[in-house]
């Protein structure tokens, strides 16, 4: 059983292209997702409504791993917080989230930098959430 904090960068909400994919701080490819086992866990922010559907649709695969969505956990664990996005969590956790306004014309390095920083933020957020869940349950 392995745990992977991941993120993707794609060309927008109605994605037609995935620019890059990162898990545990390293760039991954389609084979990474294909080879996941049911006992593996994928952790990400808004993965249930965005990343997983985009991966399954554009890569033509079915993700077999268990899923933990840190956005849903954020709503649950921090109900009085107004904004639950990764940018806001980056501010709270002191990790700057790179801003991207062009989702089609940047270099792979620029998309990868953003993706890796998102994984850093989300890893720190997941560790915080996990510690709170352990205290609660």
Language model regions located:
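Entry/capping segment at the start of metal-dependent catalytic domains
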Residues: 1-21
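Short acidic low-complexity segments
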Residues: 29-36
């Amino acid at each position: 059983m392995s745990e992977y904090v991941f993120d993707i960068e794609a060309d927008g909400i109605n994605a037609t292209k995935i620019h890059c994919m990162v898990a545990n701080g390293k760039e991954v490819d389609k084979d990474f997702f294909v080879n996941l086992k049911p006992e593996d866990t994928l952790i990400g922010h808004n993965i249930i409504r965005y990343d997983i559907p985009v991966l399954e649709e554009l890569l033509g695969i079915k993700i077999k791993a268990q899923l933990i969505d840190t956005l849903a956990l954020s709503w649950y664990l921090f109900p009085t917080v107004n904004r639950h996005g990764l940018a806001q969590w980056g501010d709270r956790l002191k990790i700057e989230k790179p801003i991207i306004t062009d989702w089609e014309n940047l270099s792979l390095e620029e998309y990868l930098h953003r993706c890796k920083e998102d994984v850093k933020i989300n890893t720190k957020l997941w560790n915080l959430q996990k510690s709170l869940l352990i205290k609660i349950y």
